[in-house]
Amino acid sequence: MKFFIDTANLEQIREANALGVLDGVTTNPSLMAKEGIKGVENQHKHYIEICNIVDGDVSAEVIATNYEGMIKEGEELAALNPHIVVKVPCIEDGIKAIKYFSNKGIRTNCTLVFSAGQALLAAKAGATYVSPFVGRLDDICNDGVGLVAQIVELYQTYDYKTQVLAASIRNTLHILQCAEVGADVVTCPLSAIKGLLNHPLTDIGLEKFLADYKKVNG
């Protein structure tokens, strides 16, 4: 399973990359706004900076919600760097745009997916990735991980090549559950990635090893 970090913060991306386990980055308009990045030109520069840090796919989202606008923005984003994956919302014009991009050899990430039906259409249109939102489904008492499992099974049944990218990951349990049901990728905050390292017995064991070493070696 691949690990992507869900952020537009360059320092967090560098820190995650330094761990040696980072496979890519996902961003969205909210994350870009959080970093105070204004204007298309500055956004494009920021995407290029991210691509220079990470040797992996970088999802950059279109803002337009109509077909023509998505095509224009998506082609501009794809031209920035070979690592760019154009992120497109799972709406009617989005599915049309994904088909267009697929025919042009431009890779896509179909985002804001909340049902297996949406995921099925995205794969049929040729999406490179599909992003079911685990945490947001859990927030409304639906089974986010269950949706990931359902999509994985559907794709295996019909041999779709679209990768299941579990998004809206809130904690380490989400990561492990998505791994168990066969997600190809999880994208999550740095805190969740680092959280996988934490276990009290590791800390206790290390403390004992060091204490025993000092008894003998001073």
Swiss-Prot record:
One annotated GO molecular function: aldehyde-lyase activity
CDD domains recorded: Transaldolase_FSA
Subcellular location(s) per record: Cytoplasm
Name used for this protein in its record: Probable transaldolase
Organism: Phocaeicola vulgatus (strain ATCC 8482 / DSM 1447 / JCM 5826 / CCUG 4940 / NBRC 14291 / NCTC 11154)
Similarity-based family: Belongs to the transaldolase family. Type 3B subfamily.
Pfam families, alphabetized: TAL_FSA
EC class name: transferase
Pathway(s) where this gene product acts: Carbohydrate degradation; pentose phosphate pathway; D-glyceraldehyde 3-phosphate and beta-D-fructose 6-phosphate from D-ribose 5-phosphate and D-xylulose 5-phosphate (non-oxidative stage): step 2/3
Reactions that this protein is recorded to catalyse: D-sedoheptulose 7-phosphate + D-glyceraldehyde 3-phosphate = D-erythrose 4-phosphate + beta-D-fructose 6-phosphate
Gene Ontology BP annotations: carbohydrate metabolic process; pentose-phosphate shunt
Transferase among keywords: yes
UniProt keyword Isomerase, yes or no: no
UniProt keyword list: Cytoplasm, Pentose shunt, Schiff base, Transferase
GO terms under cellular component: cytoplasm
Active-site residues (renumbered): K87 (schiff-base intermediate with substrate)
EC number: 2.2.1.2
Primary gene name: tal
Physiological role: Transaldolase is important for the balance of metabolites in the pentose-phosphate pathway.
